[in-house]
Amino acid sequence: MTPCLFLVLTLIPTLACLPDSPQNPQDGTLGSGAASAAAAAVDQQFIADILSRIARTGAEVGVAFRTLDGKMEWFSRADDVFHAASTMKIPVMIELFHQAREGKVKLDDPLIIKNEFHSLVDGSIYTLDGADDSEADLYKAIGQTRTLSQLCELMITVSSNFATNLLIEKLGVDNIRATVTSLHADGMNMRRGVEDNKAYEKGMNNTTTARGLLILLEAIAKGRAVDPDSSRQMVEILTRQKFNDAIPAGLPPGTRIAHKTGDITKIHHDAAIVYAPRPFVLVILVRGMAELKDSAALMADIARRIYQSAKQNTSSGPVATSKAIE
């Protein structure tokens, strides 16, 4: 049987079969408090529009969306594993604030800037090339110091790989992994620093799922990632993100958004807390599109549709689900 997407509403037993899609989101769920057939129709179109838009690209796309009130959600290929690209910098930031709370470090502690890092494969030394990084000024500071908070700012807002690796070596990969586990973000698998070519050649990469990133961002948004004050500071850092051509481009001008992007060859992600009238977390992972402008446009379109659906659906009833079934 052709896979169909069925919307099952808790209050009104409405079933709707949507067109098939190459996405075939076996775990696809849409939840909302909608308590009417009219609301169900809106939700059906919401799903159909997004899946149709994705199908036209031929890309593999993972989406995880949930309002912070927990009353509306949608997942499509949310447990598919993707190369994490620079979204892996989110757990590094969380671990920095975790160790600061534990008294192991202070955010204003100075760290000597040195371009020497250890490969996951054999512990051998490798270096980064400023020409391949999104931020070059830090390479001019080798031998000087920067505070941990300054490095965190560079890591998140301009996605500095150099700052990221300095923080990873300071904090420890195992500690970062343990904190991710404590937050139950099972889809995020943090293994190594950036540009570890020996590890990359052996397929030893940082990976994530859309659901895993959503769990981390929800923890930050709800003040649970470390503690409320640390979470607030992390949100503020994420709002200063300089790369805003994906999810933010699909939102109304002036919408506050705290997010982290990431991209490598044919990989482009955006993971966001969106402070809309009905706040939500949205994670979009894209694999297989050669041009960043095209994947950015796709993510903006998805964000636009989700923003409108969340805005229109203001009901507060029980959660509904939809699943692709054979």
What role is predicted for each listed range?
Residues 54-58, 65, 94-104, 115-117, ...:
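Sec/Tat-exported extracytoplasmic proteins
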Residues 71, 83-116, 155, 282:
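Active-site SXXK
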Residues 4-16:
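Bacterial N-terminal signal peptides
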Residues 51-52, 56-82, 105:
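Short, conserved catalytic-motif segment at the N-terminal edge
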Residues 60, 143-148, 152, 158-217:
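Mid-domain, small-residue-enriched loop/turn segments at the edges of structured enzyme/sensor domains
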Residues 21-55, 73, 170-172, 215-245, ...:
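Structured C-terminal helix/loop/strand segments within mature extracytoplasmic catalytic/sensor domains
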Residues 98-150:
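Active-site-proximal loop and beta-strand segments within enzyme catalytic domains
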Residues 33-40, 76-83, 135-142, 150-154, ...:
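Second-shell loop/turn segments in exported
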